[in-house]
Amino acid sequence: AYQEIHRLKERLVDENLALTEQLNNVDSEFGEIIGRSDAMYSVLKQVEMVAQSDSTVLILGETGTGKELIARAIHNLSNRNSRRMVKMNCAAMPAGLLESDLFGHERGAFTGASSQRLGRFELADKSSLFLDEVGDMPLELQPKLLRVLQEQEFERLGSNKLIQTDVRLI
């Protein structure tokens, strides 16, 4: 009985090492994503596929389902991973400040704008910009967002100078 227990223990140790190695291989590619179901493997395959393109990506899901983790995995597997991914929660920002935060502003563009400020699109140049809760963005900002997506250019608040940007929007 003792030999059988010892043999089973050794088998469990070997199996544990193999599974740990398998998890580490997945973790190195996908960071903090821990789901191991068939559905999750399907999602991760899609992440690998879309990461190699520069396409804009829309991630849908309920609060707490890991949209930011998927966005980070897409960024980390992309050619843009040498630069930090910029994040912004559109629902947490008051509507009046959202435009300034996204596109930046010039000194004097509005009361309290005492200096020039770079927006998230400039900060994310040659990288990825993750807009969490993008559906909460005010309708009046959507044409400006569309211009960035289509033309890769925008203007800071208080300026008419076009700024070129190379951003992948997630």
What are these regions (language model features)?
Residues 20-170:
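AAA+ ATPase active-site-proximal loops
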Residues 1-21, 61:
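N-terminal accessory segments that target, anchor, or regulate ATP-driven/P-loop NTPase machines
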